[in-house]
Amino acid sequence: MAEDMETKIKNYKTAPFDSRFPNQNQTRNCWQNYLDFHRCQKAMTAKGGDISVCEWYQRVYQSLCPTSWVTDWDEQRAEGTFPGKI
């Protein structure tokens, strides 16, 4: 189990600096990367492409966003009440 934790820590990557969001508050950065991931996924699926190119956005929003926000947004997307334009 300790080896698993060490592997996770070694492979953990946080979100890199994004010049569009230079201030400490990263709420907008979280939101934008969540939207970008789902837009990328939708576009690549429509083209029949590989959605693995979208994984970068997913890693960033998972690093920045609280889990409860992501869960709520996923539920809203499933219900059709998500406020963002994807």
UniProtKB/Swiss-Prot annotation:
Cellular-component GO terms for this entry: mitochondrial inner membrane; mitochondrial membrane; mitochondrion; respiratory chain complex IV
Chain positions found as N-acetylalanine: A2
Residue ranges of every copy of the CHCH domain listed in the record: 27-73
Gene3D superfamilies, per the entry: Cytochrome c oxidase, subunit VIb (1.10.10.140)
Disulfide bridge map: C30-C65, C40-C54
Compartments (UniProt record): Mitochondrion inner membrane
Pathway assigned in UniProt: Energy metabolism; oxidative phosphorylation
Signal peptide: none
InterPro entries: COX6B-like, CX6/COA6-like_sf, Cyt_c_oxidase_su6B
GO process terms (BP): cellular respiration; mitochondrial electron transport, cytochrome c to oxygen; substantia nigra development
Topology relative to the membrane: Peripheral membrane protein
PROSITE patterns: CHCH
Locus of motif Cx10C motif: 54-65
Alphabetized GO MF terms: cytochrome-c oxidase activity
Motif Cx9C motif, residue numbers: 30-40
Swiss-Prot/TrEMBL keywords: Acetylation, Disease variant, Disulfide bond, Membrane, Mitochondrion, Mitochondrion inner membrane, Primary mitochondrial disease
Illness the protein is tied to: Mitochondrial complex IV deficiency, nuclear type 7: An autosomal recessive mitochondrial disorder characterized by encephalomyopathy resulting in variable clinical manifestations. Features include muscle weakness, gait disturbances, neurodegeneration, cognitive decline, metabolic acidosis, feeding difficulties, poor overall growth, cortical visual impairment, and hypertrophic cardiomyopathy. Serum lactate levels are increased. Patient tissues show decreased levels and activity of mitochondrial respiratory complex IV.
Protein family: Belongs to the cytochrome c oxidase subunit 6B family.
Subunit comment: Component of the cytochrome c oxidase (complex IV, CIV), a multisubunit enzyme composed of 14 subunits. The complex is composed of a catalytic core of 3 subunits MT-CO1, MT-CO2 and MT-CO3, encoded in the mitochondrial DNA, and 11 supernumerary subunits COX4I1 (or COX4I2), COX5A, COX5B, COX6A1 (or COX6A2), COX6B1 (or COX6B2), COX6C, COX7A2 (or COX7A1), COX7B, COX7C, COX8A and NDUFA4, which are encoded in the nuclear genome.
Purpose: Component of the cytochrome c oxidase, the last enzyme in the mitochondrial electron transport chain which drives oxidative phosphorylation. The respiratory chain contains 3 multisubunit complexes succinate dehydrogenase (complex II, CII), ubiquinol-cytochrome c oxidoreductase (cytochrome b-c1 complex, complex III, CIII) and cytochrome c oxidase (complex IV, CIV), that cooperate to transfer electrons derived from NADH and succinate to molecular oxygen, creating an electrochemical gradient over the inner membrane that drives transmembrane transport and the ATP synthase.
Protein name: Cytochrome c oxidase subunit 6B1
